[in-house]
């Protein structure tokens, strides 16, 4: 049975979005293939010819590129980077990252809302990275966001679902794809997030810092698939107290001498 999701006018089957920020160009192709990802994020500084070797030469042509506005400190800078990305990559997808906190690398939600509103009006498929907050998520939705991308934990920390309860609120209240971005450190954490009902997972550091990058990419792929199967199957009830036997406790020995 088909189990896809839509962003803008495109449909995707893989729920694993791969970040490319920490790989060598030579390894990115292998990671994509093992992950079977259909969307790959790219920072514009690695995609602009002449700055350094172009990462785009290593990404298969059938992959949807998701440029990000990494380096933007406010809405104005994010909009400039997004427009440059459209010109260079010839696509409308853009991941909004507005970060002026250099210690914790937390997104500036309010500048993100401003950038989202401007870029959505210009026809971009806007995917905003944000700190999970219901009111901000509603504002992003109303501004024209195509999805909501809450962080699980600070960027690059690999600490897992620290914001789990807040992400669950977004799943329950926001009628847009919820894509968990940043902080997922293990395949099991990706599986748990998908079991909760998030649409997809974006991961980068957990894979890029593994000893065996292709194998870790594949592990994340299988974990995300398992989480989705569990979500669709509907998880069994949880007993707060006591126990419930899985086999009959009486009657088996009746009549046995």
From Swiss-Prot:
Its main location: cytoplasm. The keyword Cytoplasm applies. It catalyses: [ThiS sulfur-carrier protein]-C-terminal-Gly-aminoethanethioate + 2-iminoacetate + 1-deoxy-D-xylulose 5-phosphate = [ThiS sulfur-carrier protein]-C-terminal Gly-Gly + 2-[(2R,5Z)-2-carboxy-4-methylthiazol-5(2H)-ylidene]ethyl phosphate + 2 H2O + H(+). It is an enzyme of class 2 (transferase). InterPro entries: Aldolase_TIM, Thiazole_synthase_ThiG, ThiG. Signal peptide: none annotated. The active site is at 95 (schiff-base intermediate with dxp). Its EC number is 2.8.1.10. GO terms for cellular component: 2-iminoacetate synthase complex; cytoplasm. Pathway: Cofactor biosynthesis; thiamine diphosphate biosynthesis. It comes from the Bacteria. Keywords: Cytoplasm, Schiff base, Thiamine biosynthesis, Transferase. One of its GO terms (biological process) is thiamine diphosphate biosynthetic process. 1-deoxy-D-xylulose 5-phosphate binds at residues 156, 182-183, 204-205. HAMAP family: ThiG. PANTHER family: THIAZOLE SYNTHASE. Homotetramer. Forms heterodimers with either ThiH or ThiS. Belongs to the ThiG family. This is Thiazole synthase. It comes from Fusobacterium nucleatum subsp. nucleatum (strain ATCC 25586 / DSM 15643 / BCRC 10681 / CIP 101130 / JCM 8532 / KCTC 2640 / LMG 13131 / VPI 4355). The lineage of its organism: Bacteria, Fusobacteriati, Fusobacteriota, Fusobacteriia, Fusobacteriales. The gene is thiG.
């Amino acid at each position: 049975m088909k189990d896809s999701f839509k962003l803008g006018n495109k449909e995707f089957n893989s729920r694993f979005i791969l970040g490319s920020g920490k790989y060598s160009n030579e390894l990115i192709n292998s990671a994509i293939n093992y992950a079977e990802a259909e969307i790959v994020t790219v920072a514009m500084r690695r995609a602009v010819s002449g700055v350094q070797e172009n990462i785009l030469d290593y990404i298969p042509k059938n992959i949807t590129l998701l440029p990000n506005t990494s380096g933007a400190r406010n809405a104005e800078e994010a909009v400039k980077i997004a427009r440059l990305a459209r010109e260079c990559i010839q696509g409308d997808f853009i991941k909004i990252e507005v970060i002026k906190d250099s210690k914790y690398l937390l997104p500036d939600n309010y500048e993100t809302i401003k950038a989202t509103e401007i870029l959505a009006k210009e026809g971009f498929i806007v995917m905003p990275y944000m700190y999970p907050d219901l009111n901000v998520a509603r504002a992003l939705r109303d501004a024209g966001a195509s999805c909501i991308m809450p962080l699980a934990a600070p960027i690059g920390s690999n600490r897992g679902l620290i914001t789990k309860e807040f992400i669950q609120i977004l799943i329950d209240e926001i009628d847009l794809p919820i894509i968990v971005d940043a902080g997922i450190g293990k395949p099991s954490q990706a599986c748990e997030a998908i079991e909760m009902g998030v649409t997809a997972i974006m991961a980068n550091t957990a894979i890029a810092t593994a000893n065996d990058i292709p194998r870790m990419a594949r592990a994340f792929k299988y974990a995300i698939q398992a989480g989705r199967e569990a979500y669709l199957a509907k998880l069994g009830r949880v007993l707060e107290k006591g126990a419930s036997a899985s086999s009959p406790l009486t009657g088996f020995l009746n009549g046995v001498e």
